[in-house]
Curated annotation (Swiss-Prot):
GO biological process terms, semicolon-separated: early endosome to late endosome transport; endosome organization; endosome to lysosome transport; lysosome organization; protein localization to perinuclear region of cytoplasm; protein transport
Function comment: Component of the FTS/Hook/FHIP complex (FHF complex). The FHF complex may function to promote vesicle trafficking and/or fusion via the homotypic vesicular protein sorting complex (the HOPS complex). FHF complex promotes the distribution of AP-4 complex to the perinuclear area of the cell.
Family recorded in the similarity comment: Belongs to the FHIP family.
Pfam hit, one: KELAA
Region (Disordered): 465-510, 524-556
Modified residues (Phosphothreonine): T708
UniProt protein name: FHF complex subunit HOOK-interacting protein 1B
Organism: Rattus norvegicus (Rat)
């Protein structure tokens, strides 16, 4: 797994990358080592006189002494930063550094200056000056100063002094973080130096000290540049701790780093907006352009990404402790109650936040703890997952956000998610008749399922144009001539249609184009075309043997997730266009999965289910009948359908022209999520600034909230004959216009969804890993590397 960009962007901050005081800025005295040494000794002699003066603090000239020492120290450290090793001894210290080490210059000056802290006047100002001088020396030195004990001791004394109660100021905090950041960069270049900064316990039984680390922790959740520098420096130390058991144990056992990170996430989450200002009807998730301008959310995301990076590079002890603290200190006490707020707006916000968090983190250990929280944690006797599943059937906005969350969960390709949502209900095979259990592994090699899905396209949505010439590859047979394209096999079996195994069906060439390509290609040709006459709709209602009032037993139910998806799918005519895009995309995502149980449940049109269990084919047949009934009740349905197609095509072309940058930047590695072309629904659900010409084209056709724009009851100038609405109040007219608009868009989306299911069923026939002989043992690799969710 590639390292995150936290480490790479620190390269420009290592010593030597600053613009040096080059020859053009260098005075002649700096170019002469002997002269530099003479000047250096002269400054030191002036300082020594002041240091050795008795009672200087009480003298009237005490302030003058402080100023003189400060000025002389600045000159000496400037010369020391320019010092180089002599050519005869390139590995040894330079002449100025050798003299400073011999005289213990840094510690003596610092000790004298720290004595003035007792008086309490100007302490923060002096401390900021000291930090700035040492930062300049460390960052601009041309020699490895930290290899020498006297230099490290002086730095540790200064860092220890920074822990004393001193009035804080922005300059003091900035100087401290900048010095610590430079020290961490130097230590990262020479990891062996890290343990020199780990001080032994001051007394028996006490914990050791790593001031380089402990002084950075209070700044980890600061906003702005200061917090970013602190997190960058801490991340360097985390990476070093992976190779140092001593430092790793110190961070895990003797520091408050992990509790601070977890409790900081909780505090930052409490400051997030409880209500999200929705930018448009198609909004369903938080993208970077949505949250980057919200300071509270941007700060939280920065801290969450930092936690993800720490778990990625830190010592295993630190990783485990941080994951546990995030689960027990943030997810359970904070996210759990937030997801169960009574206000719908708060539920929408918390669900959108959770989806954003899952989409942003990439480290498997952190993803595992989020999934463990969702799948196993119970809030008021119900798991978080059950609560989220139930919300799919709620109002439009909460439904869209919930569907977006489950789309992200399925994109993780985690077997535990699929098991909890679907497979644990399908594994007993109680949803199928006993005689059908051996057929679960069957693969549709002859395109019968694809033909069945295409036969469900409503007659009112078909373009009755002459059939194109029949290509040679259209007939799929194992031998012998193919049948006439207009012939269809009789449907056998009430409730669960089947096709004679000897039949040969005319189907397109197997392919898996994106939803956008399918939609644009079919609509540009004038609608969906069938290779033969439209087949008669098979009987797709429930089996006559099932009583109307009988509820399916728990053993027969396909699970609450599939039940709520099917219920929402059956009400496609009442859903908004954006809900239908998310809904059909989620069902198609499930259908793409190669697991035989799931594939047979969704795509095997010959499977005979229990009388009380609805199949996807039955649900789609119900939607087809509703669309045809609606089309028969609207005299101008063809004109409305044409307008809706034009709008969706224009919107699709608009978002496709904007390119993939309109969507969120993927953070997950290729091993977890495979890249693919965006679907039509994804493109239409994006928020992006549009080119002027395309924006104007879409605005002409865009449906309004009042039903205008497509001739769906609004009477816009460019619309066709308006729909005759019932007389009554404005709310009734708007409600009827919305109903008509949703139904017309459903009539556009539904055929494309059927074509996609047909393409997916064909793709399974040529890509399924279960095409081996039934006598052979099938070995399927695990879906993901998350491992078990149980702790």
């Amino acid at each position: 797994m590639e390292k995150m960009n936290w480490l790479s962007r620190l390269a420009s901050r290592v010593p030597g990358h600053r613009v040096p005081q080059g020859a053009s800025l260098q005075t002649p005295v700096m170019a002469d080592p002997e002269t530099c040494l003479m000047v250096f000794k002269n400054h030191w002699s002036q300082v020594v006189r002041i240091l050795e003066r008795q009672g200087s603090r009480a003298a009237a000239g005490g302030a003058d002494d402080l100023s003189a020492v400060r000025n002389h120290t600045y000159q000496m450290l400037t010369l020391l930063a320019e010092d180089r090793a002599v050519p005869s001894a390139p590995s040894g210290p330079g002449p100025l550094l050798e003299f400073a080490l011999r005289e213990d210059l840094l510690s003596r000056v610092l000790t004298w200056q720290l004595q003035w802290d007792e008086f309490g006047d100007g302490v923060e100002e002096r401390r900021a000056e000291q930090l700035k001088l040492f930062e300049m020396l460390v960052s601009e030195a041309r020699q490895p100063l930290l290899r020498h004990g006297p230099v490290r001791e002086a730095l540790l004394a200064l860092l220890d002094a920074c822990g004393r109660p001193v009035p804080s100021s922005p300059a003091l905090d900035e100087g401290l973080v900048l010095l610590l950041s430079q020290l961490c960069v130097c230590v990262a270049r020479e990891p062996s130096l890290l343990e020199f900064f780990l001080q032994p316990p001051p007394e028996p039984g006490a914990a050791p000290r790593l001031l380089l680390f402990s002084r950075l922790v209070p700044f980890v959740h600061r906003e702005g540049t200061l917090g970013q520098q602190a997190r960058d420096a801490l991340l360097l130390l985390m990476a070093l701790s992976d190779g140092s058991p001593t430092v790793g144990r110190y961070i895990a056992d003797h520091s408050y780093f992990c509790p601070v990170l977890a409790t900081g996430l909780s505090a930052l989450y409490s400051s997030l907006p409880r209500k999200i200002e929705v930018p448009g009807d198609d909004w369903h998730c938080l993208r970077r352009e949505d949250w980057i301008g919200v300071p509270a959310l941007a700060l939280f995301m920065s801290s969450l990404e930092f936690c993800n990076a720490v778990i990625q590079v830190a010592h295993p002890l630190v990783q485990k402790q941080l994951v546990d603290y995030i689960h027990n200190g943030f997810l359970v006490p904070v996210m759990g109650p937030a997801l169960h707020k009574t206000s719908v707006e708060e539920m929408i916000a918390s669900t959108a936040y959770l989806e954003l968090f899952l989409r942003s983190i990439s480290e498997p250990a952190l993803l595992r703890t989020f999934l463990r929280f969702l799948l196993l944690h119970r809030h008021d006797t119900h798991t978080i997952l059950d609560t989220l599943v139930a919300r799919i059937g709620s109002n439009s906005r909460l439904c869209m956000v919930s569907l977006s969350l489950f789309r992200t969960l399925l994109n993780l390709s985690c077997e535990d998610v699929l098991l909890q949502l679907v497979l644990r209900y399908l594994v007993p095979c109680n949803h199928v008749m006993l005689s059908q259990k051996p057929a679960v592994r069957d693969v549709d090699l002859y395109g019968r399922a694809a033909d069945k899905f295409l036969s469900l396209i409503p007659r009112c949505c078909r373009h009755h144009a002459p059939s194109p010439p029949r290509p040679e590859h259209a007939s799929w047979a194992r031998g012998g001539p193919s049948r006439e394209p207009g012939r269809r096999e009789d449907i056998t079996g009430p409730g669960s249609p089947s096709v004679d195994s000897s039949s040969v069906v005319t189907v397109p060439r197997p392919s898996t184009p994106s939803r956008l390509a399918l939609f644009l290609r079919q609509q540009s040709l004038g609608g969906s075309e069938s290779p033969g006459p439209a087949p008669r709709s098979p009987g797709l209602t429930a089996s006559p043997t099932s009583s109307p009032g009988r509820r399916p037993s728990p053993a027969e139910e396909p699970g609450p997730f599939m039940a709520v998806l099917f219920a929402k799918l059956e009400n496609m005519l009442q859903n908004s266009v954006y809900v239908n895009f998310l809904l059909t995309g989620l069902v198609a995502q499930l259908a793409c999965h190669p697991q035989p149980l799931l594939r047979s449940f969704l795509l095997n049109t010959n499977m005979v289910f229990q009388p009380s269990v609805k199949s996807l084919l039955q649900v789609l047949g119900s939607v087809k009948n509703k669309i045809e009934s609606f089309a028969a009740s609207q005299e101008d349905f063809p004109a409305l359908l044409s307008k809706a197609k034009k709008y969706l095509i224009a919107r699709g072309k608009l978002d496709w022209a904007e390119g993939p940058t309109a969507g969120p930047t993927p953070r997950r590695s290729d091993s977890l999520v495979r890249s693919r072309r965006p679907s039509l629904g994804e493109l239409l659900l994006r928020h992006a600034h549009s080119p002027t010409r395309a924006r104007q084209a879409v605005q002409v056709l865009q449906p309004g909230r009042d039903g205008t724009g497509l001739g769906l009851g609004g009477g816009s100038p460019g619309a066709s004959t308006p729909v005759l609405l019932p007389r009554g109040g404005a709310s009734e007219r708007q409600g009827e216009a919305l109903r008509v608009k949703n139904a017309v868009y459903c009539a556009v989306i539904f055929p494309e969804f059927l074509k996609e299911l047909a393409a997916i069923s064909q793709a399974h026939a040529v890509t399924s890993p279960f095409l081996l002989d039934t006598s052979e043992e099938v070995s399927v690799p695990p879906i993901s590397g998350f491992g078990p969710l149980n702790p």
